[in-house]
């Protein structure tokens, strides 16, 4: 085929036949056109004349349908020749114009032709097609044309997914504008296309939020909630332009929200994401949308802390984006722009005298070259594959290769080199060798760090609490770490802290069997290796103690034949026997393991390498924890409790009336037995003990011995089956459960500040309202029917309302029901008037109405001025005493906190009411070495009593003096100093608080200053001065002295 006279005649005939073709022979003629045009081309010729005529025919109403049919056939995916492709793409604007035609036949043919073109072009030539589509979408007023364009973009995503991902920066704005179109059809099509386009955002961290992000574009009212959701997201995958292009609309709107917390959270996310970006060109296209919002917020936000956070985000964005002085935005790189590559190509072709008719092919090549540059494809062979067929349209093969290679070299000179790994000199099979970044919502944890793991090695993962140890382990298990092998290549099993409560009634055997890890016989055999007997294998999981539950989770993980075992605090809830068994198993099993543990002895015994968090990198050290301390002295706090500079403080407990020394018992239990309903024997039997403000008690014993049950009875969570439990009327007990997260698991979408406000908003601790010692049961209801003889009338107590001092005890104001016809069928009890209320001594009332008395005691204690104002500042200051900064307390949802941070929150909330007795069940779980040392110091200095259940002898050896050994339901105390009265020691005096006091409604209580009583000599002197002054002034004298009246 050539542009010779003969070819021109053939093309003219085909065009003429096409213009007069009928619907019956249209396809036949169009097929002939396609065959001729796509046929073998004579070297250095192009069908320019034909396509110019075809463009005119498309615009002609009479021949448009036939011409568009010809385009559809020419652009068939099986037959489009490289020599024709540039000229077909040049027809796209004319085709787009006809998609909005009022003639339905023309419109239908144009839609078909457009779809044929976008699905037939070379994927790397997307820069030649997409600008036509986005320009039409932005400029046209025809809704049918917009719908056609949106459909074409969706088809282009399927055709060139990776190439479209690089164009998301320019695509998202025009699609967003189409989503706001007033025409319903356009709006729906735009939403569908946006959803399709976001399939190119291959970022596992945000892919589940993409529907929400799209919804935010159409419905701005969803922005605040989505900002909160993203605040608790772990960013692990590389942050690409495609990721930023879908995030920027949300963040720019978040910065413009009215609520300061949303503005603040948006600034934090911007700060966090920018830290993961090393190339300024990645953020450059988004600076004009994010920078002004941050600058404006910094100047108008009133909250100083929020302004500081905004400034931090602003500084990071300026630094990463290479923003110049005076906030001059940097120039965006144009290395991949078709205009730039066209300039390079034109300079190389200047001496070749390329005919004008080949100009479409030259421009097409520049678009392909621009895309290859954007994709960072620099190898010669790929360029030859994608570009050479188009260059041979106007050059000989050898000449085309020579010029193309020079074009490639000149065009890719500014592409940065990819990152290189520093290979370790270490023998053995690699299971993983990758570089990645890790963030958790608003906090950057790791940035472009390397992780290399060998088969059969045992690694300890060490770092401060909140540094991201558990987050990294979970990200590995969920396949969210870039470059980490998939589960098919390398089976990785994550052992959870605890087994999900939904399996409570599932038997041990069935729970493991559900994991598809083998036959029940094989599972039973393996469970027995872990210490389970036949009876335990069939019992429900709920019946297992915490230690056995952890062993079950470990057994299940081992049965999955893991290549890598991820163990997060595996010694939690395990006694020393089970820890020794686990140590031996990990050393002998030959499975690669990564262990996070706060048990320094355990890490010393099992680790061959320590992976240590240093800055935002992971660094590997050969040896165990002791070896790490020798090389990194700052890691000493992981090894020795108390070596850290971190400090905790517990609030000073309030004054207890009648307690003159720290030795006096404030809790006393006598001959107490407890048995769960339906069990064959008591869990604890015949236990007696007492606690005082000076108590420092360690409760020890094997798993399942009854330690937690004993404490539950002491704190009122359970009622004893037999025996007596006395607690001081005004005592406040802080109880942190073994599974500390139970306190907060239903409040994960609150901030820590909001949780504390919810918990104490009534003045009482809402977490304790459902305790057994506050619930009225049948026995209580029966006892409350007791009849009192008052003023000669039979009465029952209807309510207890207040309390006052009475001798060495108290008496209570009671309202009554008056009995009539007692013992008869017509017996009834009539409410009496408030004027008939009477005061009864505590001893008389407590026998039958003990729980009602306890309620009044609690309210009186709160009304005595020991209530704290639930302000943000007060809560932040209290939480700071337990190592939580204001950022986490007021601006991060509980769901986004690390395990250690959640435990600190539980400690802070539990001690909010300034308790007299702190009860900790397994406090070493989930806290890092720094926090454990700080907790140990704080408990030593605490002015109240402390009871600790723990398996960690290291934690309690310097802290506790008294030991309660629990075994088989029996408790044996040692080291105790129980006294029957006040005991010896310094006398306690009631302190007048220097701080402001508040009542239960938050009102400030102003306590008047007591006047000092004057002596008789001072009174005489004062009287003389007064009389002298009166004599001098006469009638003008006015006294303000009380003594004159």
Curated annotation (Swiss-Prot):
One Pfam family it belongs to: ABC_tran
Catalytic activity: ATP + H2O = ADP + phosphate + H(+)
Compositional bias segments (type: Basic residues): 1020-1031
InterPro entries assigned: AAA+_ATPase (IPR003593), ABC_transporter-like_ATP-bd (IPR003439), ABC_transporter-like_CS (IPR017871), ABCF_EF3_subfamily (IPR050611), ARM-like (IPR011989), ARM-type_fold (IPR016024), eEF3_ABC2_chromodomain-like (IPR015688), eEF3_chromodomain-like_sf (IPR047038)
This enzyme's EC code(s): 3.6.4.-
Signal peptide: none
The protein's name: Elongation factor 3
